[in-house]
Design a protein with these regions (language model features):
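Extracellular ligand-binding/catalytic regions of CAZymes and related secreted enzymes
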Residues: 220-223, 230, 404-438, 478, ...
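A glycine-rich, often tryptophan-bearing local segment used as a flexible ligand/cofactor-contacting loop or short
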Residues: 517-594
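The substrate-binding groove and active-site-proximal loops of carbohydrate-active enzymes
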Residues: 5-12, 28-34, 169-190, 273-290, ...
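Hydrophobic targeting/anchoring helices
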Residues: 43, 62-64, 196-197, 207-214, ...
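Noncatalytic N-terminal accessory/assembly modules of large enzymes
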Residues: 2-58, 62-97
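Short helix-loop-beta junction
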Residues: 461-486
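Catalytic domains of carbohydrate-active enzymes, especially glycoside hydrolases
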Residues: 8, 14-49, 195-212, 332-333, ...
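Polysaccharide-binding and catalytic clefts of secreted carbohydrate-active enzymes
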Residues: 69-327, 345, 431
Length: 722
């Protein structure tokens, strides 16, 4: 077994001996610095590849302070304020950290700010309000009594939010606040290219420039107590300035409004059905950002080095699943791995030479402290991500943070050594091939490929009570035996043939969100295309409130193919008689007691006549199956990630595709164990996803079987005979 390569480790000025020891012990072939660390010159000649973290928009306060007009900006909205009798005064900075941002009253506020009557939805004419700089407040002289008002305004980011986050988490003392500057603007643009060349001249030993990241940070706001107030890992609200917005207006040919970004205070988060204006803005940003990225990567290449992009931080506009990214010149992607979905978020990116996953835990004091258990976190992270790696591998793994902290935990060092060796073996066995896929499935929502593997993700891989029952579907798919695609309603509208080759469509989420479509179902072309796909023999799985939008006598616009509807009160007058359960169904065959954990589930779902209810609780349908023409639909109220729910989804997809007969092909009877085949490479593996020993019967591709015992977390490799 190869015991060297494909691993990156962090270092620091005071960790040279530890770095040298772990280079050998973990078989690492690359070294990196991190935020808050420096690269020791003693390690230049180790033979390892050297990554240098490069901050395009910060770590140069001299420039930032000398050019305050080109500081980065964001749009922010005040809370709602209710008018009574007389004038209404709205303070702008309530609930916002003054360390983080300050009001931009330098640019024309009449053009770039907006006061909105939220009771009517109409903007207040600029003549009817004024700004008081001394109190940082907006006064509306004659508001409508008992109407609610907000102010949308531009603010300068005077402390980079990621640097603020790292400073707060690590309790850094007496650290100068790094001010982010806007590379899109003329002076800083020219300076940035010169600065990059000077950096490359003075760092000839660097092999890989690890851009962290490029130009615009995702939306991250803190309050006066330094608490996180608002976060959207996909948010574009900090990618704005009058300079950028004037360019946008010239391109699209219509006047910009702050509301295009503010979006009633929802900031166009991924649950909002995106407006035309917001999609136009994103497309504009992708083109502009990719062009500027290409300028920087061309410089890096001219010095004979590779350009790597960190998937996160200042990555807004990069959008690696969209075509503009392919023109950016990026050689490699590295990203943080929180689970299987975030692993696929990295490994599925097309057009780069290699991908790398930064595994958890990060070597920071929040985990590496007396009483901490970094081994447990490392095990959970590796075993969860391994499912996805076995479907679409990253090319490298790595860790980040303070190496000396990790070295205080010898059991952690032992475990990571085993992970590195296991990863190398895994990679050698599956590289260059596509694993066996039993079916092709497509997740259908408003975002499609742009949010591939990031559906239902508010912040990177963090749990939310309101969406874990939906995110679990994406997590299950990340390691399942399917070819997974992401399709948008716009894709279907543009070309219905996009569904050709798809076996099963999946629509997951709450009603009237971007994930289920909202008003798009009023478009007869979209509705008929999806229903026609199922009626002609396709499969459909709906989770939560699929197609949820009140229109023409239906709430669930996919009620016909799924055979269920939601009781909103409008149909209480109709009696419902279909309540018999059929728990002996193919989909439930592997479930303990033929029951399922639906997570938060859904209230008030009932079955239409002719629908087969699999599970109902107190006359609320949780799972149902339905024949629709030549096709089939499956309704599930929620499906949080678990090994048994992985199996439920697997069986549901096979049933929806009329392919129950293919169940015993590369299959384990124990749902805690999975089988992955790499036919081109003549290999297959059986993997125990749990922390306990497991016994199972394994079925191979020809339907033959054998019994197998696996130790905790164990993975066994076999050759495919014949």
């Amino acid at each position: 077994m190869n015991t060297k390569g494909r691993v990156t480790i962090p270092t620091d000025m005071d960790a040279v001996p530890e770095t040298l020891a772990l280079l050998k012990r973990w078989g690492a072939d690359a070294i990196r610095d991190c935020d808050g660390t420096e690269f020791p010159q003693e390690l230049k000649d180790t033979g390892a590849k050297i990554y240098a973290t490069y901050y395009t928009t910060r770590k140069d306060n001299a420039w930032a302070k000398a050019n305050p007009d080109e500081t980065q900006q964001c749009y922010i909205m005040t809370p709602f304020y209710t008018a009574a009798d007389g004038a209404l005064t709205i303070p702008l900075m309530t609930g916002i950290s003054r360390e983080l941002m300050k009001v931009n009253d330098h640019d024309d506020i009449a053009r770039w700010w907006e006061v909105i009557d939220r009771t009517t939805g109409e903007p207040v004419p600029t003549a009817d309000w004024h700004y008081d700089a001394a109190s940082e407040s907006v006064a509306i002289d004659a508001p409508a009594a008992y109407h609610e008002y907000t102010v949308s305004f531009l603010a300068y980011l005077i402390w980079d939010p990621v640097h603020m986050y790292n400073s707060v988490i690590n309790d850094w003392k007496d650290v100068e606040h790094q001010i982010p500057f806007d590379v899109r603007q003329p002076k800083t643009h020219a300076y940035t290219m010169r600065r990059l060349r000077e950096y490359l001249e003075s760092h000839p030993y660097v092999n890989v420039v690890r851009f962290t990241t490029f130009f615009h940070l995702f939306t991250l706001v803190f309050d006066e107590l330094r608490r996180e107030k608002y976060v959207d890992w996909y948010g574009y609200s900090a990618s704005v300035s009058p300079y950028i917005l004037e360019q946008f207006e010239k391109e699209v040919g219509y006047k910009f409004r702050p509301e295009f970004i503010i979006d009633q205070g929802y900031y166009n988060n991924q649950y909002r059905v995106p407006s035309k204006e917001y999609k136009d803005f994103q497309a504009f940003q992708r083109r502009e950002v990719a062009g500027l990225m290409k300028e920087m990567t061309d410089i890096v290449h001219a010095y004979g080095k590779e350009a790597m992009m960190f998937l996160g931080d200042h990555w807004i506009g990069c959008e690696p699943f969209m075509p503009e990214f392919q023109k950016s010149g990026v050689d490699a992607i590295v990203g943080s791995v929180g689970n299987g979905s975030t692993l696929r978020l990295i490994s599925d990116i097309p057009g780069v030479k290699y991908t790398e996953g930064r595994f958890l835990p990060y070597f920071f004091p929040d985990t590496f402290h007396e009483g901490g258990d970094p081994v447990r976190e490392a095990k959970e992270n590796w075993v969860t991500a391994r499912r996805a790696i076995l479907r679409k591998p990253i090319d490298r793994i790595g860790y980040g943070g303070y190496l000396k902290l990790a070295c205080e935990f010898p059991e952690f060092l032992d475990y990571v050594e085993s992970v590195c060796n296991e990863f190398r073996e895994l990679y050698e066995n599956i590289k260059g091939t596509t694993p066996y896929c039993v079916k092709t499935v497509a997740v259908l929502n408003s975002w499609g490929q742009q949010r591939a593997w990031g559906c239902h993700m508010v912040h990177h891989a963090l749990y939310q009570k309101q969406n874990y029952s939906y995110a679990g579907v994406i997590e299950a798919l990340s390691g399942a035996l399917f070819d997974v695609k992401f399709i948008s309603f716009d894709d279907i509208k543009a070309d219905p043939k996009v569904l050709d080759g798809i076996d099963v469509l999946i629509n997951v989420g709450d009603g009237d969100t971007a994930h289920t479509g909202g008003k798009v179902w009023e478009d007869p072309d979209v509705s008929a295309t999806v229903k026609g796909f199922v009626h002609r023999g396709g499969g459909l799985i709906g989770v939560g409130e699929p197609g949820g939008h009140q229109y023409q006598g239906r709430y669930l616009q996919l009620a016909a193919p799924l055979g269920v509807e939601k009781e909103t009160g409008f149909t209480l007058n109709y009696d419902k008689y279909n309540w018999d359960e059929h728990r002996d169904h193919f989909i439930l065959a592997d479930c303990p007691d033929h029951d399922v954990d639906f997570g938060e589930g859904k209230k008030s779902i009932f079955a239409l006549e002719g629908t087969e209810i699999l599970i109902q609780r107190d006359k609320e349908v949780q799972m149902a199956a339905h024949e629709y023409g030549q096709g089939r639909g499956v309704y599930i109220s929620g499906l949080p990630y678990s090994f048994v729910n992985n199996r439920v989804l697997y069986r549901a997809i096979l049933w929806a595709a009329h392919d129950e007969a293919d169940l015993h092909k590369w299959f384990s009877t124990n749902y805690n164990v999975e089988v992955h085949a790499y036919v081109k490479n003549g290999k297959y593996c059986v993997v125990n996803n749990t922390y306990e020993p497991q016994d199972t019967t394994v079925y191979t591709g020809d339907g033959s079987s054998f019994d197998l015992h696996l130790d905790a977390n164990e993975i066994k490799w076999y050759s495919i005979e014949g």
